[in-house]
Regions:
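Ordered, amphipathic secondary-structure segments that act as subunit-interaction surfaces
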Residues: 48, 52, 64-84
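Short loop/turn elements at secondary-structure junctions
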Residues: 75-143
Length: 143
C-alpha cells in the first residue's frame, strides 16, 4: 500500500506542473506510471529509514508519512526531469530530517506504536557450543 497517491501530489502542485514533470510522451496528461514510480521510490526511502523502529510497511498511514512520501516523490520527479527543484529541495531536506529523527527515536509517528525489529527478539536467539580444543598454546608449550 502506497503512503501517498497522485491525488496527494496534486494537493501540493498544480496539475499542469505534474504533467510537466511526468509527461515524457507529450500526451498532455499526467503519466500515472511515472508518478507511481516516484511514489514507490519515496515509500522505499521511508521504509528504509523507519524500519529500525517501526514494522514496515505501515498499516495505518500517519499524516506526516503521507506528507513526506508526497514531498519526496515530487522532489524525485523534479530530478527525473532535470528541473531545478527550487523550494522542493528544502521540503525534501526537512522530510528527510524528520524521518531521520524518527529513525533515531527522537520523533514518533502519530497513531503508530514503535515495534522493535524482528532481530531484536531474543526468544529465538541461537546458542553455539563446541568441544574443548585439542591443540592450544598451553598444550603445545615446549614443542
Amino acid at each position: 500500500m502506497a503512503y501517498s497517491t497522485t491525488a496527494d501530489l496534486l494537493e501540493r502542485i498544480s496539475e499542469a506542473s505534474l504533467i510537466q514533470l511526468t509527461d515524457t510522451a507529450n500526451s498532455g496528461a499526467v503519466n500515472q506510471t511515472a508518478a507511481q514510480h516516484a511514489i514507490d521510490a519515496a515509500d522505499g526511502i521511508i521504509d528504509a529509514l523507519i524500519s529500525p523502529v517501526y514494522r514496515v510497511p505501515l498499516t495505518g498511514i500517519p499524516r506526516a508519512v503521507r506528507d513526506a512520501s508526497a514531498t519526496i516523490a515530487i522532489y524525485r520527479l523534479h530530478l527525473y526531469r532535470s528541473v531545478d527543484p527550487g523550494v522542493w529541495k528544502d521540503a525534501y531536506t526537512a522530510s528527510m530530517a524528520f524521518l531521520g529523527a524518527v529513525a533515531e527515536k527522537k520523533a514518533t509517528l502519530e497513531g503508530t506504536l514503535p515495534e522493535p525489529p524482528a532481530s531484536a527478539n531474543l526468544d529465538n536467539a541461537l546458542s553455539y557450543t563446541a568441544e574443548p580444543r585439542n591443540f592450544s598454546r598451553t598444550l603445545l608449550t615446549g614443542f
